[in-house]
Regions:
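Active-site-proximal helix/loop segments of hydrolytic enzymes
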Residues: 1-131
Length: 131
């Protein structure tokens, strides 16, 4: 049976069994146009607090690598590719962790676009892990 885990439970689970934690989302911003892909980066005000201080650079490096993979696939990137938001996931994660926004309700959700998103994320993961 499927079980819904909250953000803290998902983060704790990933900290213990995963090499990284990537949460995929389509932004619920209500816009009538596709604003593109981006990752949620750690706000400056949290970067000196533990455990964030020991891991935020890994989170941002993973996010930047994923965005670059998506850019390579020709996907739209929102502004500079990141947005600072305080998230439980990155605040308590001890492994590279990122929330990826892959567009919004107005984005193209065709099989072709979903395949391009998947290919871009794989490119970014391979680059991050040096494969």
């Amino acid at each position: 049976d499927d079980v819904q885990l909250d953000n803290v439970a998902r983060t704790v689970l990933c900290n213990n069994v995963a090499d990284c934690h990537i949460s995929l989302h389509w932004d619920g911003d209500g816009l009538g146009y596709d604003k593109g892909c981006f990752y949620i980066s750690v706000p400056d005000g949290l970067k000196s607090m533990e455990p964030v201080a020991s891991h935020w650079q890994e989170h941002d490096a993973l996010g930047a690598s994923l965005v670059e993979g998506l850019r390579t696939e020709g996907l739209t990137i929102y502004q500079n590719g990141s947005m600072n938001i305080d998230l439980t996931q990155t605040s308590y994660s001890t492994i590279p962790s990122v929330d990826m926004e892959l567009g919004n309700a107005s984005s193209d959700h065709s099989d072709s676009t979903l395949n391009s998103l998947a290919d871009g994320l794989v490119l970014g993961l391979n680059a991050y892990f040096g494969n």
